[in-house]
Amino acid sequence: MRDRILPFAVSFAATCLFFINVCDWIFDCGCRSLWAGADAMCNVHLANVHHCPICSRGIAGYTAVMAAVSAPQLAASVWLPFDKVTRIVLCLLLFPIGMIAVGGLLGLYDGYWGFVGERVGPR
């Protein structure tokens, strides 16, 4: 069983470390690495601007996004019939793919990029 969980453990560690970096890459919101200020410069702390769709949802939102991004990694780690190294690579690739999918949906829902029309989500 340890062999099945190891790819998830590696990808989950990478997800936890670089989650906020990918948030900034998607939304250009001002978030920085955990060791360089994290969300201290995120636009969620500024008035009268579009707020980062991930950071604006608080701890519950972070938890939901992390669960949505990590669930496919866990499934791939446990159920795919490939060798351990291949599953590690696939699980690591699922991190940015999951963040783009979840972040994209939240950004569209919130009207973050402004090309969908009126904001329909929470401000």
Which positions does each model-derived feature cover?
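Cytoplasmic juxtamembrane regions at transmembrane-helix boundaries
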Residues: M1-I5, A67-I97
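Hydrophobic alpha-helical membrane-insertion segments
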Residues: P7-F27, L94-G104
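Hydrophobic cores of alpha-helical transmembrane segments in multi-pass inner/ER membrane proteins
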Residues: V10-S11, G58-L74
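Membrane-water interface at transmembrane helix exits
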Residues: C23, Q73-S77, G103-D110
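Extracytosolic (periplasmic/ER-lumenal) interhelical loops and adjacent juxtamembrane/interface segments
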Residues: D24-G61
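Membrane-helix interface and helix-disruption motif detector
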Residues: P53-G58, V85, Y112-R119
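Juxtamembrane boundary at the C-terminal end of a transmembrane helix
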Residues: G103-R123
